[in-house]
């Protein structure tokens, strides 16, 4: 083993006594570290590189492999620029631990739990390791219940499961960020819960934009940071694969504390779950593992399962997770999205066509799905209403080509009625959001599930056929639509 030229022999023996190792090899973000016999760190232990003259660098690594001959292979959580062979490495004796609790709300963290928002240190002594086992089966809450969001289109057609996992599909500029912020706002108001946002391998600009929009809409309260409703954790795409692979676990660890200790309902956002898989693939290649299908890591299912199994409801509280899913080349059979789908309870698909019409939230009512939409779970009334809404919209979709070519007048009386009701339904699925008040000037609306079902039943029954369709656009419950129609007449 080659020693650092600045370190004398007496210092080396002192280093060995202190249970330190030395870097023997550096390949990009991967370090090989040699330790004295009997002083080997465990898998997932955090190692901190010590600079020259015992100055601590900011490079933390995580042990991934035990190579034999008293050597370990570790993956760096930040850039390895400036590191050299022979540098001392401290074995912390524990996995990476991050701050947890109420003082994390309103703050932005990196993968190591260090605040990166220039607001000073986090006021807490409570930390938690990012590697934990999933809750035991006996701790789980197996009762199937709907997680009411107050958003009509979601609650009626693709309801979320409390403690479930939801995939959010949508391109740029269709309202994904606003939908996420509205959900954060509504869980705080209706459920007394909090949210954790994990930015996994996305653009730094997007993270900055989200933070600014959250401050503007009041989700993050700058005056009184403790009243904020969300903690943000970022591992952006310019960071090494180790950071992008572990940042999801950092966010999840913060969410678990709110669930298990504070006994709250928590919303965990992961944007983007595909980047988590991609980072794992990069790390796997760096560690020399043989790639599996389409070049992905052979441990893909295990890594995904380790993360997803910790996201669940327990008897204390729940973590409901909303995960943005990027589908490479729109290929749903790609191993990354295909592995993700196996864990999802619902999908919320955002449509560019609806956004172009000005219907927000631009949730596609026909493409969005949920395993919760069954009569034995949601009840016959909810199920029947949702199915009739979908049938009406599907028939309208089928008739659109005929309308475009021949016009409405060529349709039968029954089809014309279906089209009129479908257009009212389409507009009634829109809704003013609390977080968009600052942009639109319209006050936000939270619509309970019972009110949502009643409103769509009235449209389907034909009782509101005489009202103009613009009365249903961007309103809360059905009573507001009838009041708006009266105003339009006067």
Swiss-Prot record:
InterPro entries in the cross-refs: AAA+_ATPase, ATP-synt_VA_C, ATP_synth_F1_bsu, ATPase_a/bsu_AS, ATPase_alpha/beta_chains, ATPase_F1/V1/A1_a/bsu_N, ATPase_F1/V1/A1_a/bsu_N_sf, ATPase_F1/V1/A1_a/bsu_nucl-bd
Give GO terms: molecular function aspect only: ATP binding; ATP hydrolysis activity; proton-transporting ATP synthase activity, rotational mechanism
Superkingdom per UniProt: Eukaryota
The alphabetized UniProt keywords are: ATP synthesis, ATP-binding, CF(1), Chloroplast, Hydrogen ion transport, Ion transport, Membrane, Nucleotide-binding, Plastid, Thylakoid, Translocase, Transport
The family line of this record is: Belongs to the ATPase alpha/beta chains family.
Q: Which PROSITE patterns match?
A: ATPASE_ALPHA_BETA
One example of a Gene Ontology biological process annotation: proton motive force-driven mitochondrial ATP synthesis
Q: What is its EC number?
A: 7.1.2.2
Provide the protein's localization: Plastid, Chloroplast thylakoid membrane
Pfam families annotated for this entry?
Answer: ATP-synt_ab, ATP-synt_ab_N, ATP-synt_VA_C
Topological relation to the membrane, as annotated: Peripheral membrane protein
Q: Which gene encodes it?
A: atpB
Q: Under what name is this protein listed?
A: ATP synthase subunit beta, chloroplastic
Assembly and binders: F-type ATPases have 2 components, CF(1) - the catalytic core - and CF(0) - the membrane proton channel. CF(1) has five subunits: alpha(3), beta(3), gamma(1), delta(1), epsilon(1). CF(0) has four main subunits: a(1), b(1), b'(1) and c(9-12).
Presence of the UniProt keyword Ion transport in the record = yes
GO cellular component entries: chloroplast thylakoid membrane; mitochondrion; proton-transporting ATP synthase complex
Q: Which reaction does it catalyse?
A: ATP + H2O + 4 H(+)(in) = ADP + phosphate + 5 H(+)(out)
Q: What does this protein do?
A: Produces ATP from ADP in the presence of a proton gradient across the membrane. The catalytic sites are hosted primarily by the beta subunits.
Query: Primary place of residence?
Result: plastid
For the ligand (ATP), the binding residues are 170-177
